[in-house]
Regions:
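Extended, low-polarity segments enriched in aliphatic/aromatic residues
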Residues: 1-38, 42-187
Length: 187
């Protein structure tokens, strides 16, 4: 953070993956605590598009508690009260990005990504964290289906060829970058 020579200001969203319950594929709270507290950040996430232990807000909050994130900061499941659309530039597959309503509550975002394998995307990192991670449940479905549907129940029957998914993910990540403008950092 210090090496970037830019200060996060205002209401700061710290975008991470809170990780699947029982798993270890997330940044450990002890690793990010000092940065999160230095910028008075709120850890932000959105619910998943698949049924599991982060599909509902209540279960997602419990997963974040179990992984220790509530011990270091406030945690906001941004689509807990709805969603809204933000524009995308590249409309080859998706016409907009569907994000959690609480995104409006933040002036600045720090994208704290970790590297892991992903069944559809190849590798997860900054782009996945900013696209799939900021999208609401319906938004995740919309991206994964390359704009065919936003209905989570229809996700698995509408998967596109991989390039269409990857291009949709890139378009949605760009929309979040555009939304924050200069008020975003990538670590």
């Amino acid at each position: 953070y210090e090496a970037l020579k830019r200060k996060a200001s205002g209401r700061v969203a710290i975008k991470i993956s809170t990780g699947e319950p029982g798993g270890h594929n997330f940044l450990q709270p002890s690793l990010i605590k000092d940065l999160v507290q230095k910028v008075s950040g709120t850890i932000v996430e959105c619910n998943t598009a698949y049924v599991g232990k982060r599909f509902t807000t209540e279960e997602h909050i419990q997963a974040a508690k179990d992984h220790g994130f509530f011990d270091i900061a406030k945690v906001d499941i941004m689509d807990s009260e709805g969603e809204f659309n933000i524009p995308v530039k590249d409309k080859k597959h998706i016409q907009y990005n569907i994000v959690g309503t609480h995104l409006k509550n933040y002036d600045f975002m720090i994208n704290l990504a970790h590297f892991k394998g992903h069944a559809m995307g190849g590798f997860g990192g900054v782009i996945k964290n900013q696209s799939i991670g900021v999208a609401s449940s319906k938004g995740k479905t919309y991206i994964h289906t390359a704009g065919k549907t936003a209905e989570t129940a229809e996700l698995w029957n509408n998967l596109p060829e991989q390039d269409a998914f990857l291009e949709s993910m890139a378009a949605s990540a760009q929309s979040v970058a555009d939304y924050f403008g200069d008020n975003i950092l990538y670590i």
